[in-house]
Regions:
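Active-site recognition of the HExxH zinc-binding catalytic motif
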Residues: 59-71
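Active-site scaffold of zinc-dependent metalloenzymes
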Residues: 2-3, 7-55, 70-89
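Alpha-helix boundary/interfacial micro-motifs
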Residues: 60, 80-81, 99
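Short, positively charged interaction helices/loops
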Residues: 91-100
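General N-terminal targeting signals
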Residues: 38, 63-65, 77-78, 95
Length: 100
């Protein structure tokens, strides 16, 4: 088990497919902080680089989950949505808990 997770996280897509979310080091030749393998495939999974900071990890997690649900969307739309949602969640919930 890695340092960022006590258990395996999973999501269930619209078509009830269970997809594991795995936090581990991603090979640098991938040039990615996260990867979503085709959610329609037998080996579907989401990888998130466990070396990321909290805020970046949140945004990448949102982005890869969005890919799993809306795999056909172009990358720029997924990134825009993920960045906006990540910003709102971070500022509303995570940043405020730091201030307390």
């Amino acid at each position: 088990m890695n340092k960022n997770s006590d258990k395996t996280l999973n999501i269930k897509t619209f078509f009830d497919k269970k997809i594991p979310i795995i936090f581990e080091e991603i090979d640098e030749k991938e040039v990615a902080d996260g990867l979503c393998y085709n959610p329609y495939s037998k080996d579907a999974k989401i990888l998130i680089d466990n070396r990321l900071g909290k805020r970046r990890r949140l945004n990448v997690l949102i982005e890869e989950i969005t890919h799993a649900f809306f795999y056909e969307l172009p990358e720029y739309k997924v990134r825009k949505f993920s960045a906006e949602l990540g910003r709102v969640l971070y500022n509303q919930f995570l940043k405020k808990t730091k201030e307390k």
